[in-house]
């Protein structure tokens, strides 16, 4: 049997009732999951802090950790905003999940992650993505079609794009790595199983090339 690590997505959004997450959390715990992933879709800071605190409390009831990811076009857009959220809520099961694509787009560097207290981090989403027209992985326009398309259906295998995956991984503690790599073109070419195998194979090769054990 393959164990389950995390479930998603426990979002904070004004039109969603977070109480509806409770049955999913209960089932996740039954399946042996340890983590829940969430994201914030409002810029109302007081509101999302309150909601995150309640979700973290709900997750704790089932022995789950709640991990919030930052995305440049979401309510919590970068690492510093995510740190502020965790520091404000003060829940002992609340963490930041770093997605290497979103972090790269937000301008997060390996050096910045290395300077950050490792207590904030719990797991990583691993993937690559193309640079913008100027060759920079950071895209300033949050409505940029490349940003949205890549995130939803065009992520690249590690080493194919412009993200400093090695720098980010080396800048964080030794925590679980979860490959999140939706790519409809690759799935069409290779099939679901073939794409999954390519994800794992390229990640292993990338880590070996960059001296990551």
Protein language model regions, located:
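Active-site acidic/histidine proton-transfer and metal-coordination neighborhood
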Residues: 3-96, 105, 191, 210-213
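Histidine-acidic metal/acid-base catalytic patches
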Residues: 27-32, 57, 79-98, 104-213
């Amino acid at each position: 049997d393959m164990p389950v690590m995390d479930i998603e997505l426990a979002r904070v959004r004004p039109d969603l009732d977070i109480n509806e997450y409770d049955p999913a959390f209960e089932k996740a715990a039954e399946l042996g999951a340890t983590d829940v992933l969430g994201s914030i879709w409002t810029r109302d800071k007081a509101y999302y802090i309150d909601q995150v605190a309640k979700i973290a409390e709900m997750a704790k009831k089932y022995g789950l950790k709640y991990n919030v990811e930052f995305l440049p076009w979401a309510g919590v857009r970068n690492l510093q905003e995510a740190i502020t959220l965790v520091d404000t809520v003060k829940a002992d099961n609340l963490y930041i999940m770093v997605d290497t694509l979103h972090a790269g787009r937000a301008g997060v560097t390996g050096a910045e992650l290395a300077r950050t207290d490792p207590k904030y981090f719990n797991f990583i989403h691993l993937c690559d993505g193309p640079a913008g027209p100027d060759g920079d992985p950071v895209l300033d326009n949050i409505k940029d079609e490349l940003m949205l398309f890549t995130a939803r259906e065009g992520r690249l295998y590690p080493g194919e794009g412009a993200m400093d995956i090695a720098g980010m991984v080396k800048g964080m503690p030794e925590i679980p790595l979860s490959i999140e790599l939706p790519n409809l073109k690759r799935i069409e070419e290779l099939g679901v199983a073939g794409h999954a195998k390519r994800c794992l194979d390229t990640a292993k090769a990338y880590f070996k090339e960059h001296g990551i054990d």
